[in-house]
Amino acid sequence: MIYFTMFLLGGILGIALWFYLSGFITRLQQNIYAIYVELFPQNRSPFQPHFASIQQKKCGHILRYFFSIGVGFIFLQIAFKDSIFTVWIGLTLIILWTISYLDWHYQLISTTPCLWLLTLGLFGADNNFSLLTLSESIKSAASFFIVFYVIYWLAKFYYGKEAFGRGDYWLAMALGSFIHLETLPHFLLLASVLGICFSLIHRKKKEFLPFAPFMNLSAVIIYFVKYYGY
């Protein structure tokens, strides 16, 4: 019964994820247009999203999300045996995948899922799901944010343009709420190595290499290495 419940919960979350991703750019275009009209009401023009520089991409069939995430929740339940922890870690992985997907396809890290992720990190620390205490989680999140914020401005000053996106330091803050501050150098090194290896293997695939997927993968690896006590 618990496995069916987890499958159904995962499937429902998969459907919610599909709706979020399939309409993300459309909602973004509408928000930008609404802000433009509010700022320049005298220059109001018809809403023409098909002329926008960024367009919504297909994200697969809704049933793929339902079944894949539903089955994923079953495997998480089998692995961890704790239903509440399974839901917590499952939601975390869904948000990580969402951030990675958006950055990969649109070179955009929305602050909204980053704040969701931060909330889950702090919630997990406060309820003993995480490897950190609540105070450690807050300290680590703040430190990750500061370090990446400094890196952002140093890179911008050195290159004369944005080498990192502003979303990177918001994502770093969220990831920092899950892993110890002492692992920050390992986190940076592993994310960079993963990005470099991918770019060397697929050097002609992308002109711009999104960093969020490698940051997320680095955090997941470090978290589970610490979780299993290595």
UniProtKB/Swiss-Prot annotation:
Task: Look up keyword Ribonucleoprotein and say if it applies.
Answer: no
| Disulfide pattern | none
Membrane topology note: Multi-pass membrane protein
A single GO molecular-function term is: transferase activity
A single GO cellular-component term from the record reads: plasma membrane
Keyword annotations from UniProtKB, A to Z: Cell inner membrane, Cell membrane, Hydrolase, Membrane, Protease, S-adenosyl-L-methionine, Transferase, Transmembrane, Transmembrane helix, Transport
Where are its TM segments located? 1-21, 60-80, 84-104, 114-134, 140-160, 181-201, 208-228
Its localization reads:
Cell inner membrane
* EC number(s) per entry: 3.4.23.43, 2.1.1.-
Q: Name one GO biological process term.
A: signal peptide processing
Q: Catalyzes what? A: Typically cleaves a -Gly-|-Phe- bond to release an N-terminal, basic peptide of 5-8 residues from type IV prepilin, and then N-methylates the new N-terminal amino group, the methyl donor being S-adenosyl-L-methionine
Query: What is the top-level taxon of the source organism?
Result: Bacteria
* Keyword match Plastid: no
Function text: Plays a role in type II pseudopili formation by proteolytically removing the leader sequence from substrate proteins and subsequently monomethylating the alpha-amino group of the newly exposed N-terminal phenylalanine. Substrates include proteins required for biogenesis of the type II general secretory apparatus.
Q: Which family does it belong to?
A: Belongs to the peptidase A24 family.
Mind telling me which PANTHER family this protein's record contains? PREPILIN LEADER PEPTIDASE_N-METHYLTRANSFERASE-RELATED, TYPE 4 PREPILIN-LIKE PROTEINS LEADER PEPTIDE-PROCESSING ENZYME
Protein name in UniProt: Prepilin leader peptidase/N-methyltransferase
What is the gene name? hofD
